């Protein structure tokens, strides 16, 4: 009887120290409830890095990051992409940058105006997560209070249009999103001043 008393006391303390709950709460399998909890857990998590921090730290953006080291326009590009935004960027991976032949790349790097245009053509205003490009079906989000329709095009920082094309079905997980023919291969890298998606080809006008 005495052992039973101590057993109950220990169990009681365990429940008390586990979040202060003496009565364990029932677990739900309701998808909507789970989605809300996951949303609040991750959507509102603060992010300290900026887009510039991400460019210099991500292994898939090493070649692209070299463009920001340009002696003439590099500092102005860094300044612009460090502002509050929010921005949505579609930066080409190392493999994508290698699609540009050496001669063309050297011409691009040696022409400061073309270099600046090349970088800014990959950046748009506003905050577009991958799901928003497909059309958000859940609400409310952190920055928007209503459902967002999938855009037909986005306007970049140079006022050029990025045509959004969707292939496949989101619910079947066989979908792809293209911007001017460049496919998003790594989405939703959130930053303090926006979000970055990596694409498989440079966006060239």
From Swiss-Prot:
<protein>
    <recommendedName>
        <fullName>Heme ligase</fullName>
        <ecNumber>4.99.1.8</ecNumber>
    </recommendedName>
</protein>
<feature type="site" description="Heme binding">
    <location>
        <position position="122"/>
    </location>
</feature>
<feature type="region of interest" description="Heme binding domain">
    <location>
        <begin position="171"/>
        <end position="181"/>
    </location>
</feature>
<dbReference type="GO" id="GO:0044164">
    <property type="term" value="C:host cell cytosol"/>
</dbReference>
<keyword id="KW-1035">Host cytoplasm</keyword>
<dbReference type="InterPro" id="IPR050904">
    <property type="entry name" value="Adhesion/Biosynth-related"/>
</dbReference>
<feature type="site" description="Required to bring heme into proper alignment for the reaction">
    <location>
        <position position="197"/>
    </location>
</feature>
<feature type="site" description="Required to bring heme into proper alignment for the reaction">
    <location>
        <position position="172"/>
    </location>
</feature>
<feature type="region of interest" description="Heme binding domain">
    <location>
        <begin position="191"/>
        <end position="200"/>
    </location>
</feature>
<dbReference type="Pfam" id="PF02469">
    <property type="entry name" value="Fasciclin"/>
</dbReference>
<feature type="site" description="Heme binding">
    <location>
        <position position="175"/>
    </location>
</feature>
<dbReference type="GO" id="GO:0030430">
    <property type="term" value="C:host cell cytoplasm"/>
</dbReference>
<keyword id="KW-0926">Vacuole</keyword>
<dbReference type="GO" id="GO:0020020">
    <property type="term" value="C:food vacuole"/>
</dbReference>
<dbReference type="GO" id="GO:0004392">
    <property type="term" value="F:heme oxygenase (decyclizing) activity"/>
</dbReference>
<comment type="subunit">
    <text>Component of the hemozoin formation complex (HFC) composed of falcipains FP2A and/or FP2B, plasmepsins PMII, PMIII/HAP and PMIV, heme detoxifying protein HDP and falcilysin FLN. The HFC complex is involved in hemoglobin degradation and detoxification of heme in the food vacuole during the asexual blood stage. Interacts with falcipain 2; the interaction is direct and enhances HDP catalytic activity. Interacts with host hemoglobin.</text>
</comment>
<feature type="domain" description="FAS1">
    <location>
        <begin position="48"/>
        <end position="203"/>
    </location>
</feature>
<dbReference type="InterPro" id="IPR036378">
    <property type="entry name" value="FAS1_dom_sf"/>
</dbReference>
<keyword id="KW-0456">Lyase</keyword>
<comment type="function">
    <text>Heme detoxifying enzyme that converts heme to crystalline hemozoin (beta-hematin) to protect the organism from the toxic effects of heme. During its development, P.falciparum proteolyzes vast amounts of host hemoglobin, leading to heme release.</text>
</comment>
<dbReference type="GO" id="GO:0020037">
    <property type="term" value="F:heme binding"/>
</dbReference>
<dbReference type="InterPro" id="IPR000782">
    <property type="entry name" value="FAS1_domain"/>
</dbReference>
<feature type="region of interest" description="Required for binding to host hemoglobin">
    <location>
        <begin position="154"/>
        <end position="172"/>
    </location>
</feature>
<dbReference type="GO" id="GO:0042167">
    <property type="term" value="P:heme catabolic process"/>
</dbReference>
<dbReference type="GO" id="GO:0016829">
    <property type="term" value="F:lyase activity"/>
</dbReference>
